[in-house]
């Protein structure tokens, strides 16, 4: 079993002790009595030991108030102790500040801060400031009895004794990690939302381009298709017109022959008219206007003229028939000419329209190709963002799982979890030891703590009590019983035997004779413990291994 033992303390310029320091061997005898008048400095040893171990006063005063008010400097405490078979030398002071620790002759390297160095030292010696004030020292100044502590403070003390404080540290660390996980999750959420938004922007842009380009391409393609159809139609119509034009065969123009026959017919008609005029003259009779001879219808000349008329009429009829035939040919010829001209004009116009349609189609085709080439595809960017998003989702999934597991750990580290189970296991032992010591001090009641460290006090034939309802003497019995119980529990749990006990003015308070006798019996049974009883009352020095007297000489305390 490990042993916590104070060997020696040397101090100066602390409280009422001046430059001429005090040196006390702490492991010399089993019981030491320290006496002196009020204000004589008999409790200064306790302040020196507390300051040496923890850098704090034992009483509720500021650290600077420990410095001797006359010299106002060079407070120095030197403390020798043993723990776990290692010898420690602690040197601590103020004005100037000093904090040195030597283990088995080797000085420890100081941490970055004195606070960290102090925490490291307390881990080395297995003792905290709160534990020290509950299991090593029982006093009236600077001491708050266990029952005077708040429920959280009671629990904290017991957790320290049961060494489940590590679970509290684990809980703090776990909660810090959960906060970090929450922070990382928030950062990932921001990144995820940002990437999703970027992907959406790219996709929207692609869709917008598809819509705009698609609508434009559709419009252009429709234009191109219409122009191509128009060109094909024009080409077909031109080919058809050419074929019709080729099929039109023009003979020799009959117009001249027609006109010539017309002239001939006109001349013959004129002759006929002249002949008929002469015949009429003969029929009418009278004198010839030329020869003045008598004209008669029976004249032979009339017969000859009629023959001429008949001859001319026959010729005229032949010419008229021929002329009518030529008229048909002339009309047909002219119709063919008109058709040729119309087809030629139509072909020319359609060729121009075809050329215009082809030119437009080429321009539209170029516009289609340009519109297609201007489409921006964000596939690569989207793929990279999606890959990053997948990584974030995977990381976030891992964080969520870790947070879930840490949530389970949080439940386990709650007061109702592992710590609660450990405390519940020790509660019966607490109550057994408390009542063991109360019995030694002849208490006529049973004191019980529950898992929330609320007390129940029962006495045969009387109603339940509370700690506050007791007299100061009975409270002192309970406080002493708890002190020795915590010492026992600390020893059982840690495997450390605490070989030092300091009782500061405990016997000067509300204890009655039976209570003092009971405490004395407990102390006398602690064979391997150095007990220091600080008191201003009269005691029998013969009952103690040594008697140290503190007294004021002038303004300073000395040991005599």
Curated annotation (Swiss-Prot):
Binding site for ATP: 36-43
BP term (GO), one: symbiont-mediated suppression of host gene expression
InterPro entries linked to this entry: P-loop_NTPase, Rad50/SbcC_AAA
Keyword annotations of the record: ATP-binding, Bacterial host gene expression shutoff by virus, Degradation of host chromosome by virus, DNA damage, DNA repair, DNA-binding, Exonuclease, Host gene expression shutoff by virus, Host-virus interaction, Hydrolase, Nuclease, Nucleotide-binding
EC number of the protein: 3.1.11.-
UniProt-recorded Gene Ontology molecular function terms: ATP binding; ATP hydrolysis activity; DNA binding; exonuclease activity
SUPFAM superfamilies recorded: P-loop containing nucleoside triphosphate hydrolases, Rad50 coiled-coil Zn hook
Function (record text): Exonuclease that plays a role in viral genome replication, DNA recombination, and host DNA degradation.
Family from the record: To phage T5 protein D13 and to yeast RAD52.
Subunit (UniProt): Consists of two subunits: gp46 and gp47.
Listed PANTHER family: ABC TRANSPORTER ABCH.3 (PTHR32114:SF2)
Protein name per the record: Exonuclease subunit 2
Organism whose genome encodes this protein: Enterobacteria phage T4
Gene designation per UniProt: 46
């Amino acid at each position: 079993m490990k042993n916590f033992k104070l060997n020696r303390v040397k101090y100066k310029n602390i409280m009422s002790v001046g430059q001429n320091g005090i040196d006390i061997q702490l492991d010399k005898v089993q019981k030491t009595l320290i006496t002196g008048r009020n204000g004589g400095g008999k409790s200064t040893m306790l302040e020196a030991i507390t300051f040496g171990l923890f850098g704090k006063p034992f009483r509720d005063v500021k650290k600077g108030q420990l410095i001797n008010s006359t010299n106002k400097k060079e407070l120095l405490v030197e403390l020798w102790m043993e723990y776990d078979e290692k010898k420690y030398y602690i040197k601590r002071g103020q004005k100037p500040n000093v904090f040195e620790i030597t283990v088995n002759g080797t000085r420890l390297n100081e941490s970055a801060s004195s606070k960290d160095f102090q925490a490291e030292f307390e881990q080395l010696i297995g003792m905290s400031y709160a534990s020290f004030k509950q299991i090593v020292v029982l006093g009236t100044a600077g001491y708050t009895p266990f029952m005077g502590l708040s429920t959280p403070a009671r629990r904290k003390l017991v957790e320290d004794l049961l060494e489940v404080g590590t679970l509290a540290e684990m809980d703090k660390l776990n909660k810090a990690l959960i906060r970090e996980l929450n922070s990382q999750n928030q950062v990932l959420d921001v990144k995820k939302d940002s990437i999703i938004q970027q992907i959406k922007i790219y996709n929207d842009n692609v869709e917008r381009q598809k819509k705009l380009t698609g609508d434009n391409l559709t419009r252009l393609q429709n234009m191109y298709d219409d122009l191509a159809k128009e060109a094909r139609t024009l080409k077909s119509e031109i080919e058809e017109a050419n074929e019709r034009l080729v099929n039109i065969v023009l003979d020799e123009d009959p117009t001249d022959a027609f006109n010539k026959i017309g002239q001939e017919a006109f001349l013959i008609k004129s002759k006929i008219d002249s002949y008929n005029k002469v015949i009429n003259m003969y029929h009418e009779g009278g004198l010839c206007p030329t020869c003045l001879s008598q004209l008669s219808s029976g004249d032979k000349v009339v017969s000859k003229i009629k023959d001429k008329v008949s001859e001319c009429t026959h010729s005229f009829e032949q010419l008229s028939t021929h002329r009518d035939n030529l008229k048909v040919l002339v009309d047909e010829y002219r119709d063919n000419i008109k058709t040729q001209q119309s087809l030629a004009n139509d072909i020319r116009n359609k060729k121009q329209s075809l050329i215009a349609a082809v030119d437009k189609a080429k321009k539209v085709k170029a516009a289609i190709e340009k519109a297609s080439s201007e489409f921006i595809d964000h596939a690569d960017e989207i793929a990279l963002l999606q890959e990053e998003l997948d990584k974030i989702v995977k990381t976030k999934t891992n964080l969520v799982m870790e947070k879930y597991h840490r949530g389970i750990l949080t439940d386990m580290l709650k007061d109702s979890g592992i710590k609660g189970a450990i405390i519940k296991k020790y509660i019966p032992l607490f109550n057994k030891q408390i009542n063991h010591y109360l019995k030694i001090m002849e208490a006529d009641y049973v004191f019980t703590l529950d898992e929330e460290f609320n007390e129940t006090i029962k006495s045969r034939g009387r109603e339940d009590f509370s700690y506050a309802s007791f007299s100061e003497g009975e409270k002192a019995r309970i406080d002493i019983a708890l002190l020795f119980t915590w010492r026992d529990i600390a020893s059982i749990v840690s495997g450390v035997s605490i070989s030092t006990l300091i009782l500061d003015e405990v016997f000067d308070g509300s204890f009655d004779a039976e209570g003092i006798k009971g405490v004395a019996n407990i102390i006398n049974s602690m064979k391997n413990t150095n007990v220091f009883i600080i008191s201003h009352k009269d005691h029998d020095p013969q009952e103690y291994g040594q008697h140290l007297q503190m007294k004021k000489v002038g303004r300073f305390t000395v040991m005599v």
